[in-house]
A protein has these predicted regions:
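A short acidic, Gly/Pro-enriched loop at the edge of an enzyme's catalytic core
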Residues: 97-109
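A short glycine-rich, Lys/Arg-flanked "PGG" loop and its adjoining helix->strand segment in the class I
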Residues: 122-134
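A short SAM/SAH-binding and catalytic strip from SAM-dependent methyltransferases
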Residues: 108-119
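Conserved beta-strand signature within the Rossmann-like core of class I S-adenosyl-L-methionine
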Residues: 135-142
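Conserved alpha-helix/loop element of class I SAM-dependent methyltransferases that forms part
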Residues: 23-40
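Class I SAM-dependent methyltransferase SAM/SAH-binding core
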Residues: 45-98
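N-terminal, positively charged/glycine-rich alpha-helical extensions of SAM-dependent methyltransferases
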Residues: 1-13
Length: 156
């Protein structure tokens, strides 16, 4: 679960299935992060997937070729494996600073509101670079206090 997103003008709201309406604001954050990035027929990794709600949205609305959700919590991954039977999805337990996937295996890496909890953001970003294919995209949002934004910018 994330804090969600609401545009002031509400001009580009995603059209949602009725069963997704209760989760509109968290879904809107994912839609905002994805922006105009094409995910169809791409290999997508989400680091910090939690219980899979964001991944479910990405799979059902953007049709990636494959989706890999990675989370540190074995309980969250077990939840995803039991509850999220989505086509072309897999759920892996692992740390953001040592992603359990091979080099150059992803077209897109997504990270929503979890990097502030990681012990080493520079190591996480090194892992993102390692797993992205040439020309790949890193789609990222998180929160930082104002005095820590420039530190994050240096690492990006």
């Amino acid at each position: 679960m994330n804090y969600g997103y609401a545009e002031e003008q509400q001009k580009s709201l995603p059209s949602l299935q009725p069963e997704d309406e209760p989760f509109r604001y968290p879904i809107q954050l994912y839609a905002h992060v994805v922006g105009g990035t094409e995910l169809r027929h791409k290999d997508v990794i989400e680091v910090g997937c939690g219980r899979g709600g964001g991944g479910s949205f990405l799979i059902r609305y953007f049709s990636p070729r494959s989706f890999t959700g990675i989370d540190l919590s074995p309980q969250a991954i077990e939840w995803c494996r039991r509850r999220m039977s989505l086509q072309n999805a897999r759920w892996l337990q692992g740390s953001a600073d040592a992603l359990p996937v091979p080099n150059c295996c992803a077209d897109v890496v997504v990270n929503v509101e979890s990097s502030h909890c990681y012990p080493s953001v520079p190591q996480f970003l090194a892992e993102v670079r390692r797993v992205l294919r040439p020309g790949g995209r890193f789609l990222f949002c998180d929160m930082r206090t104002a005095n820590r934004v420039s530190e994050l910018d240096r690492h990006l």
